[in-house]
Every structure is written in C-alpha cells, then in structure tokens.
Amino acid sequence: MKIIAFYLPQYHTFPENEQWWGQGFTEWCNVKNAAPVFQGHIQPRIPLNNNYYNLLSPETVKWQVKLAKEYGIYGFCYYHYWFDGKMLMEKPMEHMLADKSIDFPFCISWANEDWTRAWAQKNKEVLIQQTYGDEAEWKRHFEYLLQFFRDERYIKNEGRPVIVLYRADKIPCLEKMLLKWKEYARESGLPGLCIMYQCASYDHRRDKAGYLFDYGIEYQPNTVRIEQRKTLQMISKKVYHIVSDKLHIPQKLNSSISYSYDDTWKRILQMNPRDEKMIPGAYVNWDNTPRHKQHGSLDYGYSSEKFKKYLSAQIRRAKEVYQKNYIFLFAWNEWGEGGYMEPDEQEGYARLKALKEALVDTGELE
C-alpha cells in the first residue's frame, strides 16, 4: 500500500509572510503560540527535542525523508502555490527537485485558494488573490511544473505524472485549462497527465469538466466533515446541552467546534466511494486551534492506538472496497492543524510506529 502524505512547505521565512504577519514568521509561530481552549486540551504541541526546523536546510529534508521511509510512508504530496505566475513557498519543492541524492517519491497539489487574514480572525482581507488567467498563463504554469513531472522520482500513474487540484470547484476555466494541460503534456513527450482533485467541495459527477479527472481523493477529515457539519447545523443552541452527550460532543466552553475522533473515523470507514475514480483518504488527527484559536475546530479522543486501528481498517478497505493501492494521508507536517507524523514531546514516535504497524499487520508494508 502506497501511503502519500500531504506536505506543508511553510516552515521557512519569505518576504510576503513577513510583510503580512511580522518579522520571522513561519508556521512554527502559530504552533508555539497555541494555547488550550478548554480544560484537558493539549496545546501547544512541541516537536521532539524542540526541532523547530527550517525547510531551507538540506539536512532537514534528508531527516524527514529518512524518517518517512523508515516508517513506511511511500511519498510526499507537496502543496504548491501559484498566483498568476507569482509563487509562494516554492523553495522546499525546488530544493527537493535539485537534490537528486534524496531518493523519495513526490507529487504536487496546487493549493489554489486566496490567502486572507482569516487565520488571525481580524477580517477576511485578501492578501493575495487566486486568479487563473488565460491560455498563456496556463502554459507558463504547466512549463514550470514540467521540470518536476520529468523527474524520475515524481509519482506517476502508468507513466503519467500525478497532479492534484486542491479546490477544483474554484476554477472557472477548469475544462479549458485541463484540456490545454493535457495537450501541453503530449507536446512535451509525456504519455499524458493523471489529474486528481482533492477537496470534497468538488464532485466530478456533477461538473461538465468532471470527465477530465482520472481520480478524486477522499481528503480526510474534510470529506466526512460535510456530513458532520450538517448534523451540527440541525442542532439549535437551545437544545445543544441535551443532545451533546449522545453526539459525543463535549460542552463548548468557547466558540470552537469539537468532533469525536472515533465518530469521525467510523463515518470514514462507513463511506462508500462515489464511483471507481475515488482514492481513499486517512488522517492522523485534527486540531486547527493553533491557527484559529478559540474559533477553530478539533477532534477529541485521539490516541496513536486508535489511529493504528482505524488506519488498518482503511488499508483493508482500500484494497477490498476501493480496489486501490494508494491512500492519501493528512498529513506529514501540518502542525498548525494537528495533522503531523513527525515526532513530538507528547508522543515521541508513536504516530509513526502506529502507521508502520498498521502496514505490517495488514501485510501491506512495501
């Protein structure tokens, strides 16, 4: 089973972030400044040995890859930020490409969203807008990506480089752009592209461009949250305290939203794929209060033992129900959202050990 972990590159300084958020800002600032939002909530999460690394250090990436390989992760899916030719946080991915000594599969997810001040809960001022341009812009973007597609380590499906679109529903020119990208791929000597979408806000069955996608990723817990939120919205504040125990939701001490880890995973394991295009997802934990403070959302009831149990079940379902040899995992290093596999002071290597044991127990360790 090939487990591909989503990879956040925001662990180094760059001018735009310092302009918007202050000198020296990286994702680690959110992580360090995190605080509990209710009694028993574990924050901040601290990397083992205070390893607040810099992704521009070659040694950091080599350490990450060594760790991922040792514990059974197949590859990384790098988030890529492209705004009409303007790029942010491109250096870690470019350094990976340049250093051929790093023997590890990787692919790219274009995180095509506006950047706003929503993190800070100040307002939704747009810091940089996501636009899509014209055909010339699509070609510039493809030509930038082509150097990665041609790398022998790049993840491919039947020779076709995998490219993931984070928010396919946000692209007004989706059909025209994807048709052109496929054309550019053929002109470049590639056998084609393997195009996937990530967020559950898009459904290939309901869009005229849906036929251009080879696969859809059940990005978790994003996908299952849609149904959970519907349940929450049906509960009025008036009767919340009566039904909270039955829904496994702790009483709110603030405006954060809490979800049961067990309930979330049980819903995931009960899902049926939309059709044969779907690739299953998994997640280790969820807690975005380091970014959103008391306005965030989080899971409660997590343990590495539970993660192992649920991941084992999802690996079996990937083979038996989805008939796929891939699972996309949230995440390798989303410390600001609770989705990280890297060792921390609280659990040490427990998350990594749980993942490897799940692969071993299911006979799927490659």
Label the predicted regions:
Residues 1-366:
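Glycan-processing catalytic domains of CAZymes
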